[in-house]
Amino acid sequence: MQVLVRDNNVDQALKALKKKMQREGIFREMKLRGHYEKPSEKKAREKAEAVRRARKLARKKMQREGLLPMKPKPVFGAGPGAGRGGPGAGARPPR
């Protein structure tokens, strides 16, 4: 795999390389090959992945047909933990 380094901009080239590797699935493959996986474990993992893919496709199809509500788009600042962590939040009373 190759990337061009333009104007000695190594950071940009590294970013492009990482993007290519991510798209090709190299990081995932490295993680899987990091240790031996028994054939039975491989079979179970692949089956679980297939089930996950099938469920995701079915969910998307139902959403397109209007049987399920569409996933709401996240509103920044109103997610989990909103309203917590402001000034004085978690302050303990004096002893």
Swiss-Prot record:
A single BP term in Gene Ontology: translation
Gly residues composition-biased segments: 78-89
Keyword Ribosomal protein: yes
A GO term, aspect molecular function: structural constituent of ribosome
Protein name, UniProt field: Small ribosomal subunit protein bS21
GN (gene name): rpsU
Family, per entry: Belongs to the bacterial ribosomal protein bS21 family.
PANTHER family, per the entry: MITOCHONDRIAL 28S RIBOSOMAL PROTEIN S21, SMALL RIBOSOMAL SUBUNIT PROTEIN BS21M
InterPro entries for the chain: Ribosomal_bS21, Ribosomal_bS21_CS, Ribosomal_bS21_sf
Region feature (Disordered): 55-95
PROSITE patterns xrefs: RIBOSOMAL_S21 (PS01181)
Organism this protein belongs to: Nitrobacter hamburgensis (strain DSM 10229 / NCIMB 13809 / X14)
Swiss-Prot/TrEMBL keywords: Ribonucleoprotein, Ribosomal protein
Any single Pfam family the record assigns to this protein: Ribosomal_S21
HAMAP family: Ribosomal_bS21
GO cellular component: a single term: ribosome
